[in-house]
Amino acid sequence: MTDVTVKSLAAEIQTPVDRLIQQFADAGMTKSASDAVTQHEKETLLAHLNRDRGNAQGKLTLQRKTRSTLNVPSTGGKSKSVQIEVRKTRTYVKRDPIDAQQAEEEEQARREAEEQAQRAAEEQAKREAELREAAEKAKRAADEQAKREAAEKAKRDVAEKEKVTNQQNENMTKPAQAEKAKREAEAAELKRKAEEAARLKVEEEARRIAEEARRMAEENAGRWEAESAKPEESADYHVTTSHHAREAEDENDRQVEGERRSRSRAGKVTKQKKGNRQSESKADREEARAVTRGGKGKRKPSSLQQSFNKPVQAVNRDVVIGETVTVAELANKMAVKGSQVIKVMMKLGAMATINQVIDQETAQLVAEEMGHKVILRRENELEEAVMSDRDTGVAAEARAPVVTIMGHVDHGKTSLLDYIRSTKVAAGEAGGITQHIGAYHVETDNGMITFLDTPGHAAFTAMRARGAQATDIVVLVVAADDGVMPQTIEAIQHAKAAQVPVVVAVNKIDKPEADPDRVKTELSQYGVMPEEWGGESQFVHVSAKAGTGIDELLDAILLQAEVLELKAVRSGMANGVVIESFLDKGRGPVATVLVREGTLNKGDIVLCGFEYGRVRAMRDELGREITSAGPSIPVEILGMSGVPAAGDEATVVRDEKKAREVALYRQGKFREVKLARQQKSKLENMFANMTEGEVSELNIVLKSDVQGSCEAISDSLQKLSTDEVKVKIVGSGVGGITETDATLAAASNAIILGFNVRADASARRIVESESLDLRYYSVIYDLLDEVKQAMSGMLAPEYKQEIIGLAEVRDVFKSPKFGAIAGCMVTEGIVKRHNKIRVLRDNVVIYEGELESLRRFKDDVNEVRNGMECGIGVKNYNDVRPGDMIEVFETIEIKRTIA
């Protein structure tokens, strides 16, 4: 016969291929869909399937449901009906002749074993009964014998006593009486000893019999245990030998036993309901009561059940406490309720709620008061361990100086640096001003110098402060024609705060109006004294445009660096500071890091503030890929988990997992401090909030190209807030304007400001659909000016009252329609109808209202000019007298602006 494949066989017998392959596998044959199947394999598979099917064909399971209604009493004396459904399952197994014969033999053996055990037990019980009867009989005989002996002895003693008494009564003397008393005492003593001996003899006999009975009982108990331990007598006999059938039979037995117990409980319930409360014991009555209540009552625990007793001795635990902990967390650490902790704190004089954060000292006092051992843990322990586990070199070498160029706006800082680097960076800056820190290192004939160019605008104070902290020497650029300006003074203050030496570059020396001596004089007023005047600062006259004095400036910088003896460890793990950071759409978070010590290599794990990551790529200031950077070298690194804050310390660590833990800890700590600062309510703030009126808010979503610019703009916008209009920055960040930013602006009714960034397509769609205000800027001046205009539009307008006319009342006429009409002469200005007026009497305002009627002769007119007569009717006022003055004015709205 031709072989067929598994797939064709499955199609022939109309079964899935996967199922047929599984059946082959169950039969012990591994097949795939394309394998051939022989006739022998078909027969093997068929036999396997028939064998499996045969196991199940002899088994029949029947289910039966019976429903009944039970009336049970409930609260209030009422009864309610409960539907009870009883489900019964019976399984019947068909036995084959072999199994039936084997089961019959097993049943016969079991019955014989039971009969034999029963006969042995009956014989043993009979022997024990005989022994007990013999022991009791012997005990009774001994008791009777002792009683008889005691009675006979007592009779003999009485007879002898009577005989002696009779003999002595005939002739009794005093010595005879004494002898008689002595004998009577001896007789009583003998009687007592005899009774004691008889009692001891009876007790000894009883003990011997009891010991014999106990020994026989122990022997019988051991023999019964040995017989019960035999497997053929203790095994659970089944009707069939099939494993599945036995399981079904056991399940059936369990259900039958459960039904028997259910019937027993139901019978008890019925008896309870009918009033028959003659239960066997108190436990039965409690069980019946629990069933009657529908299971809600608690059943008395049986004497055989174990019960857990609460330990009396208090458990002392080791409680680990951090710098801050809530009352609930402290209670969990001590395994007590929060209310107990609050009670202890109240006893110690501290009031707290369960969610209140308490400090480490308070938590320590509470835990020790409750008898626990306190282990204080520092929160930054992991951070200190990570920072200490670093490879740092030991040999310090000379390094290049880090020079920061500072000065006022447009004094030529970037142009000076451009000339040194022979590039034109200022042309790429919007408006010709530097918007963020630029870090560059240049090679000179005398050595390498790293320059940091800081913005000069007042808004970038924080950036300038960070630049001073990361620098060794400050080059203060002052224009010779402009002199000392506000940002120049600020730069001097930053340099002094950082204790950094200052080299003054007097720029624009080629201009005709240049006055270097004036610059020296002005700087000397702020503590920057030139060397020729006995000071410590070097003054160099330069021209960034013509290139004059550039070499002298570099020599002065290198000379100052030699005096400082700048050294750094070149080997080992790197340590640096983030100069600037931003989010690049294609490369992700980018951070400009100035290496302070060690060597930063590609692939190092860097921990930087709240962020961490592995350095995936490094570039220098010209955009070239590099693999390592030594001290005083600024580099751009990629691979951080987020955009770090400018000014954060960047440290290379060993373990990325620990770096992640430290970064997450810092984030959580910052969040806790921020929330605590927000939730802290001071008394003066409460009064200020109570007294301040309605304040308008200008919501802003700010996105910038770099972190430093974002911080500077945010700070400047916050300073624009007034008592009436406040600037609220609902969202800020680094990178392009995304759909999330637009959604946030729409939800908070904010305007979107983009500084050197643009919105993507999805964000523009939301801006158009929601009609949001989206504005782009490249110069900070324009941004601040337009925000001021927007805030000015939100200010409440001011109103000014301007007097436009004055009329003198000459006479008063009565009108049936308007009441008192004042006949007036316009002495100044113009009188207009429906304007506000004031009535003055003796130059005192006695009424302020509205001009209702204005007539000239009998005609209604809208206005009457100076030198003309008219009739004026004042609305809702009739007390007009001759000689009064009527002052006509109008209210003018004055638009306010923010200075």
From Swiss-Prot:
Residues 432-436 are annotated as: G2. GO terms for cellular component: cytosol. It is found in: Cytoplasm. It comes from the Bacteria. GTP binds at residues 407-414, 453-457, 507-510. SUPFAM superfamilies: Initiation factor IF2/eIF5b, domain 3, P-loop containing nucleoside triphosphate hydrolases, Putative DNA-binding domain, Translation proteins. Residues 398-567 form the tr-type G domain. Residues 65-84, 91-310 are annotated as: Disordered. Residues 68-82, 165-174 have a biased composition (Polar residues). Coiled coil: none annotated. Residues 262-276 have a biased composition (Basic residues). Residues 507-510 are annotated as: G4. Signal peptide: none annotated. Residues 108-164, 177-236, 277-290 have a biased composition (Basic and acidic residues). The keyword NADP does not apply. InterPro entries: DNA-bd_dom_put_sf (IPR009061), EF-G-like_DII (IPR053905), EFTu-like_2 (IPR004161), IF2_assoc_dom_bac (IPR013575), IF2_II (IPR044145), IF2_N (IPR006847), P-loop_NTPase (IPR027417), Small_GTP-bd (IPR005225). Residues 543-545 are annotated as: G5. It holds the Pfam family GTP_EFTU. GO terms for molecular function: GTP binding; GTPase activity; guanosine tetraphosphate binding; translation initiation factor activity. Residues 407-414 are annotated as: G1. Transmembrane segments: none annotated. Residues 453-456 are annotated as: G3. One of the essential components for the initiation of protein synthesis. Protects formylmethionyl-tRNA from spontaneous hydrolysis and promotes its binding to the 30S ribosomal subunits. Also involved in the hydrolysis of GTP during the formation of the 70S ribosomal complex. Belongs to the TRAFAC class translation factor GTPase superfamily. Classic translation factor GTPase family. IF-2 subfamily. This is Translation initiation factor IF-2. The lineage of its organism: Bacteria, Pseudomonadati, Pseudomonadota, Gammaproteobacteria, Enterobacterales.
